[in-house]
Amino acid sequence: MAHHPKRKPLSQEPQKASIEALTHEGRGIAHVAGKTVFIDGALPGETVWFHYLRRRGKFDEGRVLEVLQPAPSRVEPRCRHFGVCGGCSLQHLSTAAQLQLKQVTVREQFRHFGGVEPEQWLPPLVGGGYWGYRYKARLGVKFVKKKDRVLVGFREKGSSLIAALEGCEVLHPSVGYLLPALGELIASLSCYDRIPQIEVAAGDQSTGLVFRHLVPLTTADTEQLVAFGQAHKLQIYLQGGGAETVRLLWPAGARLSYSQFGKLEMIFLPTDFTQVNREVNTKMVRRVLELLEIKSGERVLDLFCGIGNFTLPLAIAGAEVVGIEGNAGLVARAVANATHNRLENAYFEMADLNGAEWTHYVWAREGFSKALLDPPRSGALLAVQQMSKLRVQRIVYVSCNPATLARDAGELVNRQGYRLRYAGVIDMFPHTTHVETLALFEQTRKH
């Protein structure tokens, strides 16, 4: 029988380390006794005291106890819960340094996963404000027996526990400082321990809260929820099962929407996918339009189109746009948005873009000169493998995962006959390591 050497027990003594670099997740990298240690809360160039959290085979993990020599990029976190709450990971790093980290991450991912490099890096897209930007969020809810209270918020860093938050600096102001009040509201309901989450979705004029409940609500419960909505000017929705069970409780006839360039009203349900950062989204859509260089009457394919966030602005610019989406509800909302905005040059179809080949569909055989892709984190490998068959000359790819974008870029450049003209970072999620990326591809050979 093989005998494996026992790992050394975790030292409880503070350890000193010099921080050499940052991981893509924003942890400091150090070497102690010849072994790599990833240290939460530490920045490059700093000397810190830290304690070990856990030992792994090839690396250890730790957390800062004291910063002996701070880095020039270190700033005071605005949120009192930073370091405990897992919602943000970079509030201690200046916004300029955060952006630099994201740019380095994207460059490295392109090289590592795609073996490609853009001909030119675009200047990063950033918003004007770094606080209260989060228009969309999913809040955890938990009755904690030991504290005899209901907690509402994000999970603690590295834990499944809900952090006890007095407020959130990055959440939309309509909700950011209502977290304790939401906890008190749920504590007053008959099913206080059977509500696992609240979905937050803010429009331009109002904010909606979706209460997920695992058991039926009483009349008294719904009255409490309505009173809360009235007091704080919030739309209240209930969800007793899957996404199809979401229904508006109060006020009757209410809807959520946001404006695009003052010309379009985009209507959505609170559980629909919409971009987290409204200001940056507007800048992103504008840059996509610039890169695609739309000419009147040009046929454009919008894959993973959602409610039409890009489709409708493309139609306003004069393109004949076909939006494709795999979710029937989102397709219905996209069609409704085109009708609501009186656009007759935007069409929508439903298809599983990552499930099977789709070039045989009628809409795919009609031909497109340009295409836009905005896939989920898993990327769009099957879709990009079919781009050259469609003879698409120019592609803009918007991604929330630089690793899968890099993989798909490698496919387009190395096998589908495209060149990677431009790429750039979009800072959709300040104070976190999440990074949105945009890339432009042009066809180099005819098929």
UniProtKB/Swiss-Prot annotation:
GO terms for molecular function: 4 iron, 4 sulfur cluster binding; iron ion binding; RNA binding; rRNA (uridine-C5-)-methyltransferase activity. SUPFAM superfamilies: Nucleic acid-binding proteins, S-adenosyl-L-methionine-dependent methyltransferases. It catalyses: uridine(1939) in 23S rRNA + S-adenosyl-L-methionine = 5-methyluridine(1939) in 23S rRNA + S-adenosyl-L-homocysteine + H(+). InterPro entries: 23S_rRNA_MeTrfase_RlmD, MeTrfase_TrmA_AS, MeTrfase_TrmA_CS, NA-bd_OB-fold, SAM-dependent_MTases_sf, TRAM_dom, U5_MeTrfase_fam. Residues 7-66 form the TRAM domain. S-adenosyl-L-methionine binds at residues 275, 304, 309, 325, 352, 374. Signal peptide: none annotated. Its EC number is 2.1.1.190. Disulfide bonds: none annotated. Keywords: 4Fe-4S, Iron, Iron-sulfur, Metal-binding, Methyltransferase, rRNA processing, S-adenosyl-L-methionine, Transferase. The active site is at residue 400. Pfam families: TRAM, tRNA_U5-meth_tr. [4Fe-4S] cluster binds at residues 79, 85, 88, 168. It comes from the Bacteria. GO terms for biological process: rRNA base methylation. Catalyzes the formation of 5-methyl-uridine at position 1939 (m5U1939) in 23S rRNA. PANTHER family: 23S RRNA (URACIL(1939)-C(5))-METHYLTRANSFERASE RLMD, RNA M5U METHYLTRANSFERASE. Belongs to the class I-like SAM-binding methyltransferase superfamily. RNA M5U methyltransferase family. RlmD subfamily. This is 23S rRNA (uracil(1939)-C(5))-methyltransferase RlmD.
